[in-house]
Amino acid sequence: MVTYLLMAEEKIKDINNFFFENVIDVLLVQKCTNIKAFEIKNNSYFDVIIICNVNSNIQMSSSIKKLKKLVKSKNKNFFSEGLDSSWALVEFEGVGIHFFTEEAREYYNLDDLFFDSNLMLQYG
């Protein structure tokens, strides 16, 4: 059990380094707004969840393409879904990123699902 916890902590550290140095920079350069990142504990699928707003589907697609290029350059698996809607999900290496239009974010209100999670960062 202790070994598993140590491995999980190391995984979070690796994600944090990759995450803070690269992923958030892409979101900011792509002018995504209201960015929140949560550290998710006791979840076998995600270690980090990021939620952000975009102004249009074009901005969403562009942001996802830039992230895909970054993630693939690190030889990581990348998955995206919902590119033609008001809510898209990107997944890679224990990180899930939800892109919302402002209206969709208010409607689905995912932020409240993570009220008990550690808020790692917030922009805007």
Language model: regions and residue ranges:
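Short hydrophobic/aromatic beta-strand micro-patches
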Residues: 51-53, 100
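C-terminal structural segments of small proteins and small subunits
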Residues: 89-114
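Polybasic/polar functional segments that serve as interface/processing modules
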Residues: 2-46, 55-88, 103, 114-124
